[in-house]
Amino acid sequence: MELHYLAKKSNQADLCDARDWSSRGLPGDQADTAATRAALCCQKQCASTPRATEMEGSKLSSSPASPSSSLQNSTLQPDAFPPGLLHSGNNQITAERKVCNCCSQELETSFTYVDKNINLEQRNRSSPSAKGHNHPGELGWENPNEWSQEAAISLISEEEDDTSSEATSSGKSIDYGFISAILFLVTGILLVIISYIVPREVTVDPNTVAAREMERLEKESARLGAHLDRCVIAGLCLLTLGGVILSCLLMMSMWKGELYRRNRFASSKESAKLYGSFNFRMKTSTNENTLELSLVEEDALAVQS
C-alpha cells in the first residue's frame, strides 16, 4: 500500500509537470491559465511531500527494499517533449520552483498558501505586450497625483478654517476693538451720570453769609458748572465714539462671516466633486469625452503603476 501511495503521488507530480510542459507554447490568456494550474499543482505536490517523507521513513525502517518502481514512475523522459519547448520554458520553470519553495517554507503555518506576488511577476513576464497595451497613459487618463494634490489642498484649507474657528470660539484671539468700544461707552455713561448728580447751584442761605463770601461761593459754583458741562460733552463724545466702533466691528464681523461662508461653500463644493460619489469624472487630453473611473479601477491602476 505504501509503494502504491508513493507511485500515485509521483504520477500526480508527473502529470503536473506534463501540463506545465504542454502549456509552454500556448499564447495569451491560455498561457496564464496554464501557469496558474502549474502553480496549484506545485502547491499540491509541496503539501504532499511531508507525508511522503514520513511514509518513506517508516517503509525504510520496516523493509529496506529499493523503490525502483516509484523512481521509474517519477522520472520523466525528456524525449517525450520537443527541445524547443524545453529551451523556451526554462525561465518559467525556475519561477515555478520558487513557488514550490515558498509553498514548502510556509507549510508549517498555512496549508493553502500561494505567493501572489510571484504569480503576478510571472504574469507580467509572460504578457508584457498586454500590460503595455493597457497602460493608463495611453488611454489619456490624467495623473492620479493631481487628484491627490487637489484633495490635499482642499483638506488643508478645511483644516485651517477649522483651526481658526476653534481659536475664535475658545477665546484665544482677543478683540481689542470690541473691548475699547465697551470702555468708551462705559466711561461716557459714567461722565454723564456724574455731571448730572453733582449740584451746580449754591445751597447756602445768603442771609446768614456775608456778601463777599456769597460772591466767592457763586464763582466756585460757576467754575464747577463749567467743568460739569465739559464732562457732559466728553461723555457724549465717548458714547458716540463707542457706538461708531461697535457699528464698524459689527459690519466687519458680518463681512468676515460672509467671506467665510463663501470659502466654506467653495471648499465643500470641491470636496463634493472629489469625494461625493463613487465615480470620478475625468476629461481626456485627446478629446472632450468623459470617462468614469471607479474606485476599484483606481486601486488597480495604482498597483500597476
From Swiss-Prot:
It is a multi-pass membrane protein. Residues 52-88, 123-143 are annotated as: Disordered. Keywords: Autophagy, Cytoplasmic vesicle, Lysosome, Membrane, Transmembrane, Transmembrane helix. Expressed in heart, lung, and placenta. The chain crosses the membrane at residues 178-198, 232-252. Residues 58-78 have a biased composition (Low complexity). Disulfide bonds: none annotated. InterPro entries: TMEM74-like. GO terms for cellular component: autophagosome membrane; cytoplasmic vesicle; lysosomal membrane; plasma membrane. GO terms for molecular function: transmembrane transporter binding. GO terms for biological process: general adaptation syndrome, behavioral process; macroautophagy. It comes from the Eukaryota. The keyword Lipid biosynthesis does not apply. It is found in: Lysosome membrane; Cytoplasmic vesicle, Autophagosome membrane. Plays an essential role in autophagy. TMEM74-induced autophagy may involve PI3K signal transduction. Belongs to the TMEM74 family. This is Transmembrane protein 74. The lineage of its organism: Eukaryota, Metazoa, Chordata, Craniata, Vertebrata. The gene is TMEM74.
